[in-house]
Amino acid sequence: MTLAQHQYIERKSGEVRAERPFGDWIVNYLYCQKREQPPLVYQLLGSQWFSSLLGWVNYDFPFGSSLTGIQRFLKNCAINLSECFEPPEKLDTARKVFERRIRYWQCRPMSSDPFEVVCPADSRLLLGSLARTSALFLKGKFFAYEELLGPDKFLWLDAFRHGDFVICRLTAEKYHYNHTPVAGFIRDFYENDGHYHSCNPGPVMAMATPYSKNKRVVTVIDTDVPNGSGVGLVAMIEIVALMVGDIVQCYSTKEYDDPAPILPEMFVERGCPKSLFRPGSSTTLLLFQKDRVQFSPDLIRNLYRTDVESRYSEGLGRPLIETDVQVRSTIGARKSTKEGYGDD
């Protein structure tokens, strides 16, 4: 099986880079051949048991690194250990590297503009819209809208209908803490059960609406409040994936001190650590209400570049190009105060 190249644009340098997804060949083989797989095999691929087993072998099993190539992966993934909160010598296991903390207050600067939306994670980012009249409209390939939020969540389904969204895909080498993209009060916090399927580009294109099939945690933030970001309601959806068996809520207002669970009606500041994905690749999705946010122009331009190869193409009409973005960097702003913000 020949795999198409998957490229992305690094935001800081503007360079086009090629991604080498961890376990690329075997993961794509299993998912791209899913129509030929017995139903039991496909169910096993997305089960919590299988995901936890793979995570244990890769990150906890004493000989897992040598058996699955993790040591080679760690050597080649270009992790900047100088950013780490802990001394590098303490990061002596694959799990510790994956769950590392960084000095984000120094190495991930954030705009002082309170009405700007910041990226929730070190990730590769896609933009989209649920409104058919929008230039960013994407038909339901990545998720089924009602399934994503929950069919019984009528208030939120009505609030975000025809809105915009951001998909932030965390690859295995990334810093795996999620940070709050906006400031405001938590209006709802709940979990939707589901599978643990891979969120790599190949499997995502091979499956139907994968992000609404996987287990996910939904946090709804009201930003139209005093000291809020003023961009309406924002849904932050943290989605598990293959080898990600857990999402730990650990909100901190100062560095990583005194981590607290997320609770309804608590106020969250923008850019603070909110949660940690346990090992594997994973995805965070942001939903915005219609006409409340204007995305950064460089992210819009990158999305449809024709000189970059992407696996995000099947059933989409045209390839979609990811931009590699750092956590806490600006990805959009309140429309009312940033007229023309997203114009070329």
Task: Identify the role of each PLM range.
Residues 1-344:
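Contiguous, well-folded functional domains in the mature portion of proteins
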